[in-house]
């Protein structure tokens, strides 16, 4: 048996902790020790409340970095804004993760979007696995491709940022007497990359000869309240089963969230909407008998079993569960990672990426296409059929088997946690 440190450093929302939760529970059930170091302890408290493992605050960058291009166009530029500008700004974060390894007496590490933890693991000689989607498990290319590829990028910009980040990492590694990192892409996967995606929803183009082990999306498949669909407008028809059922997971930060809800009502839809800001007390943006606002997160498996359409911001967990249920999507991405996901899903024919349409957004026409034309439903059904053999429980068991192998590797190497590198 081994002690695992589970870490999350970058990114927001609940998806990162949601990916780690079933793996933490599974490792513990198999007799391993687990300690979680999380970017956000407050927002994840409810999600992880039933998980009996120690949870501590991860070492994270708290400052605004001057001199980083806006907006960032590559993973390297993101890292420049999170402490990787110079070796002396990165080193304290690495020291924090080294301390986390010592305090956890870690024999092995599993991270979700935690590159600095992976730097520390290289220094400490701790075998490390990295789980997640393609955005932070990039292709084996130098430099790593830009993700904001829809806008002009000055020649050499991506390569220069990557060289600067690599210089900072290698400066820290040199301080600890550790071999340099040859290429930045080699950092993100650690010793055991666990790419939880499929080619159709991958964020990057990958070379045909790159060997990729596609494990399918990893998410929490259950939990939340059962779906409660509105009855519809009692003045129209019999008021029962009136109009297509649409599950909408929206956030008030998107400028078109209210316009989209108005369009759904105008299209005669019955909308079950989870809008986190409303659950926190914000006045609902659109009031209609055709919209029911959920008071807490909804069980997506149950919702998509009954839905005719999904509307969301293109987070992988929501998109994957909709597609596996054969439900087409209207996607309203809020940032680059989501835009890439939305673009990929639209290419399958199973979705419309609203961010690719002219503004002001013509939601009426988009909804008409998604609800009345068979092509999108057929594409979503075809996606579900292609991946009909995918089951979350089987995937989790496979991931745990791989992590067991990492633990055996740690034990064979004779890892001695007390001797992890010190400042």
Where are these predicted regions, by residue range?
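A short, glycine/small-residue-rich beta-strand->loop->alpha-helix junction that serves as a flexible
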Residues: 8-21, 253-254
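Donor-nucleotide binding loops and adjacent catalytic segments primarily
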Residues: 24, 202-309
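Active-site-proximal region of nucleotide-activated glycan assembly enzymes
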Residues: 127-203, 209-210
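Conserved nucleotide-sugar donor-binding subdomain of glycosyltransferases
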Residues: 71-110, 114-116, 157-184
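C-terminal amphipathic helix plus adjacent low-complexity
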Residues: 185-187, 365-423
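Conserved nucleotide-sugar donor-interacting segment of glycosyltransferase catalytic cores
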Residues: 91-155
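Conserved nucleotide-sugar phosphate-binding/catalytic loop shared by glycosyltransferases and other
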Residues: 34-86
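A donor-sugar binding/catalytic signature common to diverse glycosyltransferases
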Residues: 108-113, 138, 297-342
């Amino acid at each position: 048996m081994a002690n695992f440190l589970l870490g999350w450093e970058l990114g927001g929302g609940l998806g990162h902790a949601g990916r780690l939760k079933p793996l933490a529970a599974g490792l513990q059930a198999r007799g391993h020790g687990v300690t979680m170091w999380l970017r956000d302890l407050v927002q994840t408290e409810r999600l992880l409340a039933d998980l009996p493992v120690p949870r501590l605050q991860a070492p994270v960058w708290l400052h605004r970095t001057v001199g980083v291009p806006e907006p960032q166009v590559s993973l390297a530029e993101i890292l420049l804004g999170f402490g990787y500008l110079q070796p002396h700004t990165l080193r304290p974060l690495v020291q924090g993760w080294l301390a986390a390894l010592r305090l956890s007496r870690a024999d092995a590490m599993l991270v979700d979007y935690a590159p600095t933890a992976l730097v520390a693991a290289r220094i400490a000689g701790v075998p490390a696995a990295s789980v997640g989607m393609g955005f932070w498990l990039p292709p084996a290319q130098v430099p790593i491709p830009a993700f904001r590829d829809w806008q002009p990028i000055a020649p050499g910009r991506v390569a220069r940022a990557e060289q600067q980040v690599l210089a900072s990492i290698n400066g820290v590694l040199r301080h600890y007497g550790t071999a340099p990192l040859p290429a930045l892409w080699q950092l993100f996967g650690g010793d055991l990359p666990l790419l939880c995606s499929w080619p159709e929803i991958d964020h990057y183009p990958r070379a045909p000869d790159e060997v990729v082990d596609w494990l399918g999306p990893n998410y929490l498949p259950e939990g939340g309240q059962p779906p409660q669909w509105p009855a519809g407008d009692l003045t129209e028809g019999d008021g029962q089963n009136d109009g297509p059922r649409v599950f909408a997971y929206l956030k008030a930060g998107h400028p078109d969230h209210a316009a989209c809800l108005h369009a759904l009502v105008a299209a005669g839809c019955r909308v079950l909407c989870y809008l986190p800001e409303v659950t926190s007390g914000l006045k609902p943006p659109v009031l209609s008998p055709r919209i029911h606002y959920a008071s807490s997160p909804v069980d997506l498996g149950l919702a998509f079993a009954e839905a005719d359409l999904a509307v969301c911001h293109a987070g992988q967990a929501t998109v994957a569960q909709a597609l596996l249920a054969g439900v087409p999507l209207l996607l309203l991405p809020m940032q680059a990672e989501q835009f890439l996901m939305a673009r990929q899903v639209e290419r399958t024919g199973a979705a419309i990426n609203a961010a690719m349409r002219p503004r002001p957004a013509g939601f009426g026409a988009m909804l008409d296409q998604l609800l009345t034309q068979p092509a999108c439903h057929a594409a979503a059904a075809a996606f579900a059929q292609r991946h009909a053999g995918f089951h979350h429980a089987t995937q989790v068991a496979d991931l745990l088997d791989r992590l067991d192998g990492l633990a055996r590797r740690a034990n064979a190497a004779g890892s001695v946690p007390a001797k992890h590198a010190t400042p």
